[in-house]
């Protein structure tokens, strides 16, 4: 959520920055609402003061033996006007907030302008894609040869965009997640979290999935009216982990917080019809190891570089070629101020595919969550900055390993760093 003071005092500058994202801010609507809000604010304060004054007059008139009925009627009339003005002000403020909740974050000055992912900018490349002297197989074919990926059973059990993993492929999938968690907790300073996979709507508002992206979620009940019994499956562990600091005031010396969690993620993939229908690239349910940092505002840009580096380390230790791109304004997520994507080399597709997205959300989520900290010697509180990133998507890492480590006879070599998690196994198949 954007700072209301920016919308009041720097509206044209905000509109200009949002235009970089291809978002048209209704400037006239905001100006009219703000003018009306000021009028109603003055009116309610004036009516409240007048009503208080008249109420005091009743006691004085009564002490003098005067007829107080006219004064009492006047106080009642002022009370009715006050309630009406308050009701209008409350509704207007709710309308202002509802509109503010639909506004995306402002892009950082360092983010390149662009309309879509074709205008993202590559900033770094690591590793060289292997050359093969045999015909490459994709991960689906390799999964069939090793009897490790069973899509027909998943379709029977649930539907499309699900998978059943079996045997050593299932074990490799588990090993990947364990390796990532151990790396992030033992070397990168993250605290491992186990979190609910179902969250309430206040949590989804906090990290920005609601109200705008309800259609991307799996809800336990239709989203008609909010109640405590309505939940949604998490689209990413970012949602429950970041909300750990909702309505919390931290002390400055508690920052930064670094948290990681391995969870399944559930996404409806609305708008993705016909895209990546084969294999594990785009699923309704997939596993991810998430990285979250809660930091001092002055350190969030450095934290973005650090967090992205932690995700990159996974790829480097697995010896998987990748590239790092900074997303342009037209491709950034709703709550992000700046985002790096890591794209891993997928040989069968002869291209790089996203495997991690690392974002600095600035104070956008913190304002929604009222996540704050108190600086040393200061009574006032400030909003923290929040960051999140995939460290990494487990299923896509499995795809990359299967395809990059395939052999001519259809086996899959186990990356050396994963062999301790596989009881020393060197090959699958």
Curated annotation (Swiss-Prot):
Gene Ontology cellular-component terms listed: cytoplasm
Alphabetical GO biological process terms: selenocysteine biosynthetic process; seryl-tRNA aminoacylation
Entry keyword Aminoacyl-tRNA synthetase: yes
EC id: 6.1.1.11
Locations listed in the record: Cytoplasm
Binding site for L-serine: 236-238, 290, 390
GO molecular function, one term: ATP binding
Presence of keyword NADP: no
Record field: catalytic activity: tRNA(Ser) + L-serine + ATP = L-seryl-tRNA(Ser) + AMP + diphosphate + H(+); tRNA(Sec) + L-serine + ATP = L-seryl-tRNA(Sec) + AMP + diphosphate + H(+)
Pathway(s) served: Aminoacyl-tRNA biosynthesis; selenocysteinyl-tRNA(Sec) biosynthesis; L-seryl-tRNA(Sec) from L-serine and tRNA(Sec): step 1/1
CDD domains: SerRS_core (cd00770)
Keyword annotations from UniProtKB, A to Z: Aminoacyl-tRNA synthetase, ATP-binding, Cytoplasm, Ligase, Nucleotide-binding, Protein biosynthesis
Residues that, per the record, bind ATP: 267-269, 354-357
Primary location recorded for the protein, binned into one broad class: cytoplasm
NCBIfam families per UniProt: serS
Domain statement: Consists of two distinct domains, a catalytic core and a N-terminal extension that is involved in tRNA binding.
Chain's role: Catalyzes the attachment of serine to tRNA(Ser). Is also able to aminoacylate tRNA(Sec) with serine, to form the misacylated tRNA L-seryl-tRNA(Sec), which will be further converted into selenocysteinyl-tRNA(Sec).
Subunit-structure text: Homodimer. The tRNA molecule binds across the dimer.
Protein's UniProt name: Serine--tRNA ligase
């Amino acid at each position: 959520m954007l700072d209301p003071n920016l919308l009041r005092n720097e509206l044209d500058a905000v509109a200009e920055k949002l235009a970089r994202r291809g978002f048209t801010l209704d400037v006239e609507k905001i100006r009219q609402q703000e003018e009306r809000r000021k009028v109603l604010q003055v009116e309610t304060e004036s009516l409240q003061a007048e009503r208080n004054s008249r109420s005091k007059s009743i006691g004085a008139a009564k002490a003098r033996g005067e007829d107080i009925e006219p004064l009492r009627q006047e106080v009642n009339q002022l009370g009715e006007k006050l309630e009406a003005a308050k009701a209008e002000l409350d509704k207007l403020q709710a309308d202002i907030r509802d509109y503010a909740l639909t506004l995306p974050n402002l892009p950082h000055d360092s983010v390149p302008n662009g309309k879509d992912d074709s205008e993202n900018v590559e900033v770094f490349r690591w590793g060289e894609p292997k050359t093969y002297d045999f015909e490459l197989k994709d991960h689906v074919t390799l999964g069939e040869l090793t009897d490790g990926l069973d899509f027909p059973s998943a379709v029977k059990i649930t539907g499309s965009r699900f998978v059943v993993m079996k045997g050593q492929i299932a074990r490799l999938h588990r090993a990947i997640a364990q390796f990532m968690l151990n790396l992030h907790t033992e070397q990168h300073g993250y605290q491992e979290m186990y979190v609910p996979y179902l969250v309430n709507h206040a949590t989804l508002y906090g990290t920005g999935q609601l109200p705008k992206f309800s259609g991307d979620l799996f809800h336990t009940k239709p989203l008609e009216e909010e109640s405590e019994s309505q939940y949604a499956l998490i689209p990413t562990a970012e949602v429950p982990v970041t909300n750990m600091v909702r309505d919390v005031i931290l002390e400055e010396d508690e920052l930064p917080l670094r948290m990681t969690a391995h969870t399944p993620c559930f996404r409806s993939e609305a708008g993705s019809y016909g895209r990546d229908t084969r294999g594990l690239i785009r699923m309704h349910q997939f596993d991810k190891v998430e990285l979250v940092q809660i930091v001092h505002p002055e350190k969030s840009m450095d934290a973005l570089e650090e967090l992205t580096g932690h995700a990159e380390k996974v790829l480097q230790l697995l010896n998987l070629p990748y590239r790092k791109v900074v997303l342009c304004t037209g491709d950034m997520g709703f709550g992000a101020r700046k985002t790096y994507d890591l794209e891993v080399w997928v040989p069968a597709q002869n291209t790089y595919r996203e495997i991690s997205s690392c974002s600095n959300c600035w104070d956008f989520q913190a304002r929604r969550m009222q996540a704050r900290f108190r600086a040393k010697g200061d009574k006032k509180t400030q909003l923290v900055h929040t960051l999140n990133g995939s460290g990494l998507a487990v299923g896509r890492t499995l795809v990359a390993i299967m395809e990059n480590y395939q052999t001519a006879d259809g086996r899959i070599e186990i990356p050396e760093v994963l062999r301790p998690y596989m009881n020393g196994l060197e090959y699958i198949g």
